A protein has these predicted regions:
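Active-site beta->alpha loop and helix N-cap motifs at the rims of alpha/beta catalytic domains
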Residues: 52-169, 173-176, 183-187
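Hydrophobic faces of well-ordered beta-strands that scaffold small-molecule active sites
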Residues: 10-18, 46-50, 81-89, 116-119, ...
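Glycine-rich phosphate-binding active-site loops on the catalytic face of alpha/beta enzymes
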Residues: 120-123, 180, 226-243
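Catalytic cores of alpha/beta
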Residues: 156-168, 213-229
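Terminal or standalone catalytic/regulatory effector modules within metabolic enzymes
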Residues: 35, 41-59, 292-300, 304-453
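C-terminal helical cap(s) of enzyme catalytic domains, especially alpha/beta-barrels
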Residues: 239-261
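N-terminal amphipathic alpha-helix/helix-capping segment at the start of soluble metabolic enzymes
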Residues: 1-24, 76
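Phosphate/diphosphate-binding loops
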Residues: 261-275
Length: 453
């Protein structure tokens, strides 16, 4: 599908991945998806995001599904639509850095089993953490979409993102995605940024946002006027709120204009009817709280904190019986973030900064207690931080420990063969070793049940 200079707008629907990850704790099953696939395949989407992110973990841990089998079945059910996944660079779909051989094999197997487009991101926008995944995507004939984690800070200027986009282009990416995971990108800022990206790079631009702060659809509209090529939306039963703006609304808003998506509204209505039932079940089962996921959270804008991180902080404070410290913690988050060199707040940095802010407030003294993860971040174990850290804080947290400046994965020896030996008794399929590499205990339990051992 070629990218035209302004029209029509191309749509990636997130209904099979980020929509339920954002609204219903990633609990949608393959059974929920399959009845809609035949019609989904006729709509004419640019792509369907259906795999990666938290779905892999959720399949194994909660749904007793093999994520690889889910992908193969979706591939068969959606023969005419590009399938897309979200990959965390060197973290793959786990929560730590993996060796290059594991990253390479994971990308190969994702593409072998039916993925067309791999959107890769890194929480710190450290391109060294994405290099291997992007090279592998290209080597195995996938489409490499590289994401910039969007955030606001004194260092995250338009110039910063333009330079990052140029580096991404030089790296061999096919598309550049602005990944606004917290819904912080405001409409006129989006317009200005996309105009600049269009002027300084030749690659198509994709916008991924959330409606957490109530500004998502406006941001998409301004992005469209600025010439964005593709936007992420979610079908209405799981659209809006903490998810993406609703597909049907964007399609209707652009109908009859030069940006007309050309998507069939009748078909969208049919599919939405099916997913309404799915959303109702997810609500009934307690995985989706409409009041929470659909209410506008303006605090996200005020404190630059993603919606998921807010609920996490509330959980930690309730556990500590310290809800009266909520606003003190919200005010501490930006201070910790500044001390740590302004990391974007997305997995895993959102958890690291949030937990440290809670400890600083509850401990009565800043950095009296420091988590292992905070120390790792300050030591460079997660990659290069966007700005210089507060050296006084670093000294207090890690003393004279050595700070690494090279790519963290350079320290990791090949791991694949070791993992293969460890799960010899289970291997029904080559992909099992990857499930085990990412989530050893969870995968072993799943494989034992599957193989009747």
């Amino acid at each position: 599908m070629e990218f035209l200079s302004n029209k029509p707008l191309l749509i990636t629907d997130t209904i099979l991945r980020d929509a339920h990850q954002s609204q219903a704790a990633t609990r949608m099953t393959l059974e929920d998806m399959l009845p809609a696939c035949e019609v989904l395949d006729k709509v004419g989407y640019y792509s369907l995001e259906c795999w990666g992110g938290a779905t892999f973990d959720s399949c194994l841990r909660f749904l007793n599904e093999d994520p690889w089998e889910r992908l193969r079945i979706l591939r068969k059910a959606l023969p005419n639509t590009k399938l897309q996944m979200l990959l965390r660079g060197q973290n793959i779909l786990g929560y730590k850095h993996y060796a290059d051989d594991v990253v390479d094999y994971f990308v190969k197997k994702s593409i072998d089993n039916g993925i067309d487009i791999i959107r890769t991101f890194d929480a710190l926008n450290d391109l060294r953490n994405m290099e291997k995944a992007v090279k592998a995507t290209k080597a195995y004939n996938g489409t490499a979409e590289v994401a910039m984690s969007y955030t606001t800070s004194p260092v995250h200027t338009e110039e910063y993102f333009v330079k990052l986009a140029q580096d991404i282009e030089a790296m061999g990416a096919d598309l550049i995605c602005i990944k606004d995971m917290a819904g912080l990108l405001l409409p006129f800022n989006a317009y200005s940024l996309i105009k600049k990206l269009k002027a300084h790079t030749k690659l198509p631009i994709v916008l991924h946002t959330h409606n957490t702060a109530g500004t998502g659809a406006m941001t998409i509209l301004k992005a469209v006027e600025a010439g964005v090529d593709v936007v992420d939306t979610a079908l209405s039963p799981l659209g809006g709120g903490t998810s993406q703006p609703a597909t049907e609304s964007i399609v209707a808003a652009l109908k009859g204009t030069e940006y007309d998506t050309g998507l069939d509204e009748e078909l969208l209505a049919q599919i939405a009817e099916h997913f309404r039932g799915v959303a109702e079940r997810l609500t009934k089962d307690g995985w989706r709280d409409p009041d929470k996921v659909l209410s506008v959270n303006a605090k996200a804008l005020q404190y630059q904190v993603p919606g998921g991180m807010l609920s996490n902080l509330i959980g930690q404070l309730k556990q500590a019986n310290a809800m009266d410290k909520y606003y003190a913690v919200l005010e501490e988050v930006p201070r910790v973030r500044k001390d740590f060199g302004y990391p974007p707040l997305v997995t895993p940095t959102s958890q690291i900064v949030g937990t440290q802010a809670v400890m600083n407030v509850l401990g009565g003294e800043r950095y009296k207690m420091v988590t292992k993860e905070s120390k790792g971040l300050l030591k460079g174990e997660y990659g290069r931080l966007p700005a210089p850290v507060n050296e006084e804080v670093r000294k207090k947290c890690i003393g004279d420990d050595k700070v690494i400046t090279h790519r963290p994965a350079d320290d990791i020896a090949p791991e694949l063969e070791g993992y293969r030996k460890e799960i010899r008794q289970y291997s029904q399929q080559e992909e099992d070793v990857l499930s085990y590499a990412l989530f050893p205990q969870v995968a072993e339990k799943f494989l034992a049940i599957r193989d009747g051992k």
